[in-house]
Design a protein with these regions (language model features):
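Residues lining hydrophobic/aromatic ligand-binding pockets adjacent to catalytic sites
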Residues: 1-136
């Protein structure tokens, strides 16, 4: 199971493995509050600054953040979260006050909608696309 929560909220025993997904360490948070810091899964700082500065809309930010999860340096941390989620609960943490406009909700949805998750839910492999973009 994969959950998402704000790092400044009080801890709970149901959080399982606590994964911080921010590029910068949050102020006032002790290192003992998280089990793993996977900063590669946080948005790159120029993207975050552009969104917070009003230069990007939420849909633009979403597209760019999700595209960033395809980067080679994000693959090992993504695999680490997926592996931990197979064994129990993983809670993704960041400091954003609004979860509906936060990368932690985007990452959670991305992980839950991964090809492996879709295969488990449907019981079959996803359809492959042809060179023209149609399904086989």
């Amino acid at each position: 199971m994969i959950a998402a929560k704000r790092i400044y909220d009080p801890p709970s025993s149901s959080e399982g493995m606590r994964v911080l997904i921010m590029r910068l360490w949050p102020r006032g948070i002790r290192k003992t509050r998280v089990d793993v810091w996977l900063k590669e899964l946080g948005p790159v700082l120029p993207l975050l600054r552009a969104f917070r500065g009003g230069k990007l809309t939420w849909p633009q930010y979403t597209r760019r953040y999700l595209a960033g999860l395809e980067r080679p340096e994000a693959q090992a941390p993504l695999a680490q979260v997926r592996a931990a989620a197979k064994d129990g609960t993983v809670t993704l943490f960041c400091g954003c006050p609004d979860e509906t406009r936060c990368h932690r909700s985007l990452l959670r949805a991305y992980l839950l909608d991964s090809p492996a998750s879709r295969r488990r839910k449907s019981g079959r492999a996803p359809r492959r696309r042809t060179a023209r973009g149609g399904a086989r």
